[in-house]
Amino acid sequence: MFKRTVILLAGPTGSGKTAVSLKLAPLVDGEIISVDSMQVYQGMDIGTAKVSLAIRQAVPHHLIDICHVQETFNAVDFYYHAIQACQDILSRNKVPILVGGTGFYFHTFLSGPPSGPSPDFALREQLSLEAQERGIGALYQELVELDSAYAATITKHDKNKIIRALEIIRKTGNKVSSYSWESTVNESKEYHCRGWLLSPDPELLRHNILERCDQMLEEGLVDEVRSLVALGIKGNTSASRAIGYREWIEFLDAGSPVERFEDTKQKFITNTWRYTKKQRTWFKRYPLFRELSPMGMTLGDIARKIAQDYFLCG
């Protein structure tokens, strides 16, 4: 069958993915889908280098600010949200551009979701309305009564998971806990994917990370973390352990001692650098992502190269 083309733009933290994507989107009449496991959370702005609202108004973005920090969000959630976003973008004859550095989310998008029923967006909308009317706590209690085993694996704040679980139960009559959630390759996926991996020189990347971490601190990262702690981020293991957040949560928990600031900053930088190594290793396992070194190229040059490839092959 005919497959619509989707652009994938990956790379390690600090490689310039966001800047390139903002140049690329107008060239192909595209909209951006964030492939970042932390940008889904409201309030996690500075530490995730989230683009501003003004930029998002100029270039439409998807999968940003869709969860409260007390909710959990994983690769399965990402898959269904990303597919829905792709369908929406393509229905308006625009081009989906998936941009980010969360390798496992790209893997899930490419390989297909774990086994389980397909989403029922109408039923999901109905459940969302019920959550507004009855409260998410009431829906969680309903889930406890219908599938206590699965309910025990999440919290009463996990709105997305509670709604998805009740969606499955109401649609199929089966418990969520009865399904196998191991990922399988989906050979019949409907998208033709053109993948690119930004791979800057390690020294340039290290320089970018140093600047990035300094800039985040200047913009108020510590105050952002303090606000998120007040909102309950420590109850979300995934969000509270994210690089750029866990280091400063520990700093605040210790009473914000001045003498520990520089050590915490260095830990923040070191952890970010180590993560980029893991990202590069992950993406190089996938031949779909063609490596692109930005050396000697402007952001516009890179965007034009990707756009040219899209028009030739898309």
From Swiss-Prot:
The record's annotation in NCBIfam families points to:
miaA
Q: Which co-factor is required?
A: Mg(2+)
Role played? Catalyzes the transfer of a dimethylallyl group onto the adenine at position 37 in tRNAs that read codons beginning with uridine, leading to the formation of N6-(dimethylallyl)adenosine (i(6)A).
Q: Which EC numbers characterise this protein's activity in its record?
A: 2.5.1.75
* Interaction with substrate tRNA, as annotated region: 36-39
What InterPro entries does this protein's entry cite? Dimethylallyltransferase, IPT, P-loop_NTPase
Which GO BP terms sit in this record?
tRNA modification
User: Protein name, please?
Assistant: tRNA dimethylallyltransferase
Give the gene that encodes this protein.
miaA
Q: Which residues bind substrate?
A: T13, G14, S15, G16, K17, T18
Subunit structure of this chain's protein:
Monomer.
GO MF annotation: an example: tRNA dimethylallyltransferase activity
Q: Give UniProt keywords alphabetically.
A: ATP-binding, Magnesium, Nucleotide-binding, Transferase, tRNA processing
What organism does this protein naturally occur in? Chlamydia muridarum (strain MoPn / Nigg)
Q: Which reaction does it catalyse?
A: adenosine(37) in tRNA + dimethylallyl diphosphate = N(6)-dimethylallyladenosine(37) in tRNA + diphosphate
Family listed: Belongs to the IPP transferase family.
Query: What residues bind ATP, as annotated?
Result: G11, P12, T13, G14, S15, G16, K17, T18
One Pfam short name = IPPT
Point out the annotated site residues (description: Interaction with substrate tRNA).
T102, R124
Q: What is the lineage of its organism?
A: Bacteria, Pseudomonadati, Chlamydiota, Chlamydiia, Chlamydiales
